[in-house]
Amino acid sequence: TAAMRDPNREGTPEHIKKAYTWLLSKQKDSGAIYGKGLATYNTSISVMALCASGEKAHHKNILAARTFLISMQQDHEGNKLMNKHHGGVGYGSSDPHSNLSVSYMAMEAIVTANIIARDSGEGKEDELDWESAMKFVSRCQNLEKTNDQPGIANDGSFNYDAASSKAGEKELPDGRKVKRGYGSMSYAGLLSMIYAELDQDDPRVVAVKKWLNENFTLEENPGVGQQGLYYYYNVMAKALTAANIDTLTTKDGKKIDWRKALAERILSKQREDGSWVNENSRWWENQPELVTPYAVITLEQIHASMPQPAKPTK
């Protein structure tokens, strides 16, 4: 995906063609695309890569993978309101429990592939149950008016899933212990709601935007420190672009041009060999093979979404 979104790319380099050949060799009869595990996660990022190719030859593979992702949505018949995993997506058979990270990536892949699905000419394609998906997403948000789960804060931020947060808990002034939301999942929550086409005035959207403005920082992934920092940068760029947000306003009223600030931050962290790496190893971010694509795709997202200067009037 990073290579294909290069704004200076001319054609498809031979080594990328080989990469696509390898990727397609990993597609299963179910439509899933993965090697040894994490079926839904790997299929989601594979769909994004295949869509980036622009090749009609990949459409059949994309549609099969899209159908697989839709089939992985948790559907707990007869217990939908009680089961906190209902409507979301998990890593796969080894870990079926829904989480917001995989759910948002699956939604992104499905939405990205929608135009191919609509133009396939093969009849009506399967669709995600968006109402159930938003029920799961709402249960990941710290917002009392729309979350029926216990132990949540009321600040609009998002947790990893409906039962827990990777940022742990915090104690409120009244002594209650609640889940602490954090940056990367809050941007993932915003993106999920945009993919579901929620209105910008929806209280869930308003609440998370407020939290993201007030907690903006590039020094850390707010709530979890240096953990998942480049994942945070990546989902930040995608969410703010999708939300048509050009500036953020911090608690002290400072206006932030997030594109400029984020690009400068990432470029300042590039190593001499051209790669990026996170000194914190959580979620494999000590591996340049993972973090460098995060950084490159983030920069490409910034470049592609930059507002065009107004044409001079005659």
Which residue ranges define each predicted feature?
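Surface-exposed loop and membrane-interface regions of Gram-negative outer-membrane beta-barrel proteins
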Residues: Y20-A32
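An alpha-helical repeat/solenoid feature that recognizes helix-turn-helix modules
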Residues: T1-H15, D29-T67, S71-E264, S268-K311
